[in-house]
């Protein structure tokens, strides 16, 4: 029934999230080739996610005025056509182009959920939304695995070129397949009214707690995957291409995110959230081990639990926010990607100063704070045993 919509949205997720993380697997090589520290190399990821975070709310406002389809198509195409990355002659130019990609990518996560909520029958929204999320997951995976694989026989510039080529294909599929909107009603929104709605959400202590969790979760997740390559190539002596295979553990998150809904039905949101954070901490603690197999198992557990926690928290935002839910969702993703940008960059300095053990302690400290926040939310927010539907703007 919704084949073209599904094809288009999966393509948008693949194209945009492929572009978003295409340098993450290359950080050790960038450090060596461009003679920069891990923290500086990580700016090729942090600049992208930071600019994405700053652009999500403006992109959402623009989509309310000019339509979701236009924003999604422009976002997917421009993010991939900014594929001048392989031509970058300096780290400064590379970081600048990556920041521009972040602005371009923002249109997809800012509007995709709203498009599906408006155009898909409510009965089918969860299934179609799940396929879109799967597309973003596989897109993020391909953006990491493709360049790391190409590194086995070519330079990082060719690795990025290969990633961009794949993203362009999916961007044009999105442009061809995405149907015209039938139920969209333009709204004359202003930045002032939108930020006023967001300010009301920030003043809500339960929503602020959920936003903070998004910041801490994503910060820890991206930090781990930003710098685990240095551990795998340095301590364990793996090649860059083999080390890139660690990103296949990302697929455990595709499974755990879908299982989170089942677990919520059985145990409630609070228990699933706290259990997921504890699992993340156990997985992180295992990374103190000097053994490769133990480290892989730790990353596997951490990744699966991260996606479960993200699924719970993002759904809970729509429950706690009884009005202006679109703005609450935008604020959630703003904090989510700012965590990636800020914590990811700071973690590079921690790694440079205190090496791997210091990085693990730093990330565990953030997860300990997240545990306390989760316990606060569990005490102050009713925990339902139903999976919330995607949030709609209830104004």
Which residue ranges define each predicted feature?
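Conserved MFS/SLC helix-loop-helix module at the cytosolic interface between two early adjacent transmembrane helices
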Residues: 54-91
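Helix-to-loop junctions at the C-terminal end of transmembrane segments
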Residues: 56-67, 256-268, 351-352
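Structural signature of the two symmetry-related core transmembrane helices
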Residues: 70-84, 271-285, 364
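Paired small-residue
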Residues: 92-101, 293-301
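Cytoplasmic helix-loop-helix junction between adjacent transmembrane helices
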Residues: 97-136
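Helix-loop-helix hairpin linking two adjacent transmembrane segments in secondary transporters
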Residues: 122, 131-179
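Juxtamembrane intracellular "pre-TM" segments in multi-pass secondary transporters
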Residues: 179-210
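C-terminal transmembrane helical hairpin of 12-TM major facilitator-type secondary transporters
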Residues: 270-313
């Amino acid at each position: 029934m919704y084949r073209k919509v599904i094809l288009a949205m999966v393509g948008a997720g693949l194209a945009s999230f492929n572009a978003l993380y295409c340098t993450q697997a290359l950080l050790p090589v960038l450090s060596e080739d461009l003679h920069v520290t891990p923290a500086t190399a990580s700016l090729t990821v942090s600049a992208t996610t930071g600019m994405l975070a700053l652009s999500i709310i403006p992109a959402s406002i623009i989509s309310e005025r000019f339509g979701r389809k236009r924003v999604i198509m422009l976002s997917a195409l421009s993010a991939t056509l900014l594929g001048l990355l392989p031509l970058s002659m300096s780290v400064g130019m590379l970081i600048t182009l990556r920041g521009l990609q972040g602005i371009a990518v923002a249109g997809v996560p800012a509007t995709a959920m709203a498009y599906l909520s408006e155009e898909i029958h409510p009965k089918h929204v969860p299934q179609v939304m799940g396929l879109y999320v799967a597309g973003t997951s596989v897109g993020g995976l391909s953006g990491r695995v493709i360049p790391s694989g190409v590194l086995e026989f070519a330079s990082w510039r060719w690795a990025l070129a290969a990633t961009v080529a794949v993203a362009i294909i999916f961007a044009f599929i999105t442009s061809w397949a995405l149907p015209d909107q039938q139920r969209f009603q333009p709204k004359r929104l202003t930045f002032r009214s939108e930020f006023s709605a967001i300010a009301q959400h920030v003043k809500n202590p339960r929503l602020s707690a959920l936003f903070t969790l998004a910041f801490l979760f994503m910060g820890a997740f991206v930090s781990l995957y930003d710098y685990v390559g240095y551990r795998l190539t340095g301590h364990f002596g793996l090649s860059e291409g083999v080390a890139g295979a660690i990103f296949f553990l990302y697929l455990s998150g595709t499974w755990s995110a879908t299982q989170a809904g089942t677990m919520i039905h059985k145990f409630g949101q609070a228990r699933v959230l706290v259990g997921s954070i504890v699992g993340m901490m156990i997985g992180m603690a295992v990374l103190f081990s000097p053994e490769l197999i133990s480290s892989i198992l730790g990353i596997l557990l951490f990744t699966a639990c991260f996606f479960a926690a993200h699924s719970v928290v993002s759904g809970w935002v729509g429950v706690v926010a009884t009005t202006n839910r679109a703005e609450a969702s935008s604020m959630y993703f703003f904090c989510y990607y700012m965590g990636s940008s800020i914590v990811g960059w700071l973690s590079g300095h921690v790694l440079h100063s205190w090496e791997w053990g210091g990085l693990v302690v730093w990330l565990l400290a953030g997860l300990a704070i997240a545990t306390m926040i989760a316990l606060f939310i569990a005490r102050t927010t009713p925990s339902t045993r139903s999976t919330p539907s995607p949030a709609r703007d209830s104004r």
